[in-house]
Regions:
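Donor nucleotide-sugar recognition loop
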Residues: 79-85
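Alpha-helix capping/helix-boundary segments
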Residues: 9-10, 37, 69, 88-89, ...
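Short, well-structured N-terminal submotif of metal-dependent ribonuclease cores
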Residues: 1-33, 42-58, 122
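Acidic catalytic patch
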Residues: 39, 59-79
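Acidic, PIN/NYN-like endoribonuclease modules and their adjacent C-terminal/linker elements
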Residues: 90, 94-122
Length: 122
């Protein structure tokens, strides 16, 4: 595992964005999702489609939130002013030594946050 997928990349995939699908296909063996990502992605689907999306998400290891993650997320939120889900994503990535794969370059500027990967732009 080398990468933590942010929800925006998976949502792009489900919305038919070819760049997202190509990236996921090329990096699937190295990628994981967080419980935050899973919840954010599945929220966008109706029940039947959510089951299909969940099966796709099941292809990736799912990383949870523990006390150390919560503590680091609080520090990162104070320091950077991130929304709590973004702070949790960053904390999970950092504690597991993963790169955070996102399209959210507004909050996660790769030149400022070296653990961030912006795989494509729309």
């Amino acid at each position: 595992m080398k990468l933590l997928l942010d929800s925006v990349v998976l949502i792009d995939h489900f919305n038919g964005i070819a760049a997202a699908t190509s990236y996921l296909s090329a990096h699937r063996p190295d990628a994981a999702v967080s419980v935050i990502t899973r919840a954010e992605v599945l929220t966008g689907f109706e029940r039947r489609a959510a089951r299909k999306a969940a099966r796709f998400l099941d292809c990736f290891p799912t990383l949870g939130i523990d006390q150390a993650t919560a503590d680091l997320a609080a520090v990162l939120r104070r320091k950077h002013g991130w929304r709590l889900p973004d702070a949790f994503q960053a904390a999970i990535a950092r504690l597991h030594g993963l790169r955070l794969v996102t399209r959210n370059s507004r909050d996660f500027q790769p030149q400022r946050h070296r653990f961030v990967v912006i795989p494509y732009r729309l």
